[in-house]
């Protein structure tokens, strides 16, 4: 496909054309100069898609479960996008886990679009990029967006929180129920899923989660379900879709969906403003002054708080006499 002008690529992306859409998502991920114009064009068309987060520890079968969820939603006539947040190989710079390899059952369906968001060695900013990619997919007409993350670290939890509804996927073995309580997953879960439930211990793991939920102070009227699935054979997938749809109905009826989305937009705005202010600040501080500031800090001649205050106020450290240090 020949190179398109920015406005033409944006127009065709909003029309749902797959190749321009893929290029548009690359703009977002790589912070292309045209990404801002793209996102501005998309924003007014967002809000129609239900964004589902799928998170949990590695090895929980999330990719297989996401594939089955996409197939079930397609059977119901919904257009589905999958955003798979993958680790990146430090050698090749590409996604270590190829989403099209894992989800090749979906590749022939024009109603499904699959995209990796690679971490490129750092999770910084990935939650913002994921939310922006979902905006593009939302504006392009996808009705269900599945956001899969690879683990349960803080950054993965931030990515999961870009969703309207989040399912935490665990397996019967390895004390996942205990880990869920330790890793803060209780706070972000709208649904719990015990996948690979054809293995021994699935009922016991589900009961452990239910007991933990019962002991926890309720923060809303939504009763968090604990579901059993065996994604490799398709068992329990229909029930999981029904649970997601019940949660969407509850979110909508109670006004919680609107509140969550407003809160996410506020967090996103705050993150973008912080990023812009930092960029402006660093552009105003000469490199030599910045190095002097770091040296001042490293030699314990000034505290971080005092130095930060002075840098912000003056745009750089004031040179002064350096007292000899005792050895």
Regions found by a protein language model. Give the residues of each.
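Flexible active-site lid/hinge loop adjacent to a nucleotide/diphosphate
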Residues: 159, 172-200
